[in-house]
Amino acid sequence: EKPKQFNYDVYEGSQASCITPVHTNPYNLTGKGVLIGIIDSGIYYAHPAFIQDGVSRIAYLWDQTVSDDSSRSDIIPFGTLYDRDTITKAINAENSLEMQRICPSIDISGHGTHVAGIAAGNGNGNDNEQNTKYRGVAYESTLIIVKLKTSGGASFPTTTQIMLAVDFCIRKSIDMNMPIAINLSFGTSNGSHSGTSLLETYLDYIAENYRCAVSVGSGNDGAGFGHANGKSYPAD
C-alpha cells in the first residue's frame, strides 16, 4: 500500500467549530468586555497567550491549593488569591525563581492551561507576535482562573469546591460589572443523572439568574462502563 500523508487537523479547528465567522464581519466578536472563568487545574500564567503588552490578561487567580491566611475572606475560605498586579509582577520577574516566589501557582497537569488557551488564548507565542491561526475563541477577553483543590487522596475536587469556585467567579463578575462565561471541563458518572443533584441545580440557578453562560463537559465517560451492560434473555 502506498504511504499516505497526514496533516494536523487542529489548524482548521476554529473553522470546524464555526468560530471563524463569529470573529469576522459583520459580528467581529473577540471577547472584549467579557470575562472568561476557567475552573480547572490552574494555568501557566506566564504563557504569552495570556499576556498583552506586558500585562497579564488574568484579573484574578484563586489557587485553592496554596495556603495563605492573609487571603482568607467570605468568598476565599482557603487557598490564595492573586490579582492582576501580582501576576504581572511575577511574569516580569528577573528569573523563574523570583517569578515563583511572587506567584507560586503551578498547573501541574497542563489541562487548565490548554482549556484556557482554547477558550481565550490571544495567539501570542514566544516571540510575542500574534498568530491568528492559534488564538482562542474569546481572544480579547479577561480571565478569572480557579485552580481547584483535591479532596483527601482523591485526584479530583468535590462538588463543594466547584460550587465555591463558581460563586467566586460570579462575585468577581458582579464586582467588575462584566458578563462572564464559565467553563467546567470535567465531570463524573456519579450522581442523580436527572439534573436534580445539588451541583446541577446550583448551576441551573446561576445560569438563569445572572448574565452568564456555564459550559460543562459531558460524554467523556462513554467508554468507561459506567452504565448497565450485558445480555438479556426472556424469563422461563
Labelled PLM ranges:
Residues Y11, H23, H47, H111-H114, ...:
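Histidine (H) residue identity feature
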Residues E1-N25, L35:
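Autoinhibitory N-terminal propeptides
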